[in-house]
Amino acid sequence: MSFADAMREEGRFTRTENGAVALNTSGDARLDLFGTIGSLREADENRITTLFAGAYAQDKLFATKIAFYARDIRGGLGERKTFRTIIRYMAEKHPEALRPNLDLVGVFGRYDDLYELIGTPLEDDMWAAMKKQFEEDLQNLNAGNAISLLAKWIKTADASSPATRKLGILTAQKLGYPIYNFKRIVRSMRKQIGVVESLMSAGRWDEIKYPEVPSRAMMIYRKAFMKHDAERFGEFINKAEKGEVKINASTLFPYDIVEKILYGRESNKVLEAQWKALPDYVEKGTNALVMADVSGSMRGRPMATSIGLAIYFAERNVGAYHNLFMTFSDRPETVILRGETLEQKICNVSRANWDGNTDLKAAFERVLEIAKKHNTPQEEMPKAIVVISDMEIDYCGNLEWSFYDKMANKFCKAGYVIPNIIFWNVNSRHDVFHADHNRKGVQLASGQSVTVFKQILQNLGYNPVEAMENTINSERYDCITVE
């Protein structure tokens, strides 16, 4: 190897905040983006655009699909801020890639994402796309047909915020309507699609159809519903708890619910009902164990995400690891879920050892310790281990091997094959990867959404790139094109 190549090889390595050897790239720029894009909520714009730029340089169509996967509220990660940062960057640097997909922004995300393009080279294209959808909705409204959700998110001049009012005036002008007429049309559209905020502001609480209230609106306004419509809303929630009526939760993240109980100490029937209503993406017979990072660096929302995803998976997994998972900080612990309600389960889990350092090595050693103590045969070991963490794991005592190499060696010496490992990043602060792009039996994931479980469990045994390509190249994203 030449010295230049040796320098490049050495340049791939980094250390976590706690001293463990890791890689600063997976070796595939697309995978670097995919493996972190759901965990960049606290990242600065430069880091987000740098990751996207690297992936775009490698494959512009694939990188664009990753961006829309990240925004995809129902089938992807539901990341709003990161997506908006990326589409603004695309409009400035690569308008040819975003232009043919403007009509899809409101399909995968929200129509108000389009406002991010004001002041960019694609502003005129954005207004044209919005006007086209608005005119189509107006025709359907007049014909008594279903319309899109554009009217829910479009800005009007009667908003309470001065900035939003200004944007509403601009919107009416750009779409070619007098301001008053525009407000009137939007009001009619919102009535057609049943925008709950319109009914609330008009004091028409008795007209709200609670089974039709969107997931996030139900969570945000739950106290207002109880205050202004206690009898009807209370009756609805009681029925929802029993499964007699539907309560929407499909676009919520587990942390949305968990953090209100974990940090807000809130006991609420709405939260319990929405938790039960979260979509189930865990297939029967799934042989996988979750390791949830509860170390000090995970405080706040990352902790609620880690615990929420672990509880979600454990209670819905009807296989061998039903109601079982592990936590790790300075000391790993086996958790057996107890309690009937989510509040009870969170209370019991919170008694575990939290807020220490991030000793993932000890957690894997604990798996081996339990297996050897009870003479567990290979076929009864977990097929997969899902590590939910910020990936800033502790120093493992070897200057050359990555964490995965060390653990694979330990399992081999103990007479076991290391399980498939999914490194699921929920709060990426640095470019840290614990496996490269061609490591078979390892997958990289990121984000806060339960849909990730479905994707990773369908890709066990693949290498990280294959698993990523199976997700991004699905039919759902075939509609995305670049010029």
Residue ranges, per PLM feature:
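Long lumenal/extracellular ectodomains of secretory and single-pass membrane proteins
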Residues: 1-305, 315-483
